[in-house]
């Protein structure tokens, strides 16, 4: 039987705090959602002034990143993104009752080479959502480093 790392509330809150700190620094009201490896929210936070649509969008991005083990923007990356017209996953955004997000702002949480969850952000443009998401992943990396755990902290993640 395989022993697996599990994302817990402490780590999820730490990530959300880092994302909100970055969003505040760059002046963007974000919604941030951290999900477990099953795609269910551990923490969902909407900053004051963030759009009312943000919670669902952030959750969808986190769900997709966790479940499909890749950053959501990679589905549409030129020239061979799998969700582009003519490619193998064209139309995938219609699956899971429309919850499958194929645009920027969702990142898998990878610890010791295993996807243990996802983080989704909504509120800024693609660059802003990415900056906040990477800040959250970097914060998790710093938190877990003393335990000897490695965390991927970058925008382009595909497992």
Predicted segment positions?
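Flexible, solvent-exposed loop/hinge segments and secondary-structure transition points
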Residues: 1-159
């Amino acid at each position: 039987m395989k022993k697996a790392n599990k994302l817990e509330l402490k780590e999820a809150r730490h990530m959300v705090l880092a994302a909100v700190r970055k969003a505040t620094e760059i002046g963007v009201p974000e919604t941030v959602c951290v999900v477990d490896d099953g795609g269910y929210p551990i923490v969902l936070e909407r900053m004051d002034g963030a759009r009312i649509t943000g919670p669902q969008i952030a959750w969808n991005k986190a769900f997709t990143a966790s479940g499909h083990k890749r950053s959501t923007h990679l589905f549409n990356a030129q020239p061979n993104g799998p969700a582009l017209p003519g490619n193998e996953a064209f139309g995938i955004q219609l699956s899971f009752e429309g919850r499958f997000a194929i645009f920027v702002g969702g990142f898998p949480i990878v610890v010791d080479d295993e996807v243990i969850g996802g983080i989704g952000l909504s509120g800024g443009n693609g660059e802003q959502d990415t900056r906040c998401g990477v800040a959250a992943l970097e914060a998790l990396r710093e938190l877990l480093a003393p335990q000897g755990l490695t965390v991927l902290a970058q925008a382009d993640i595909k497992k």
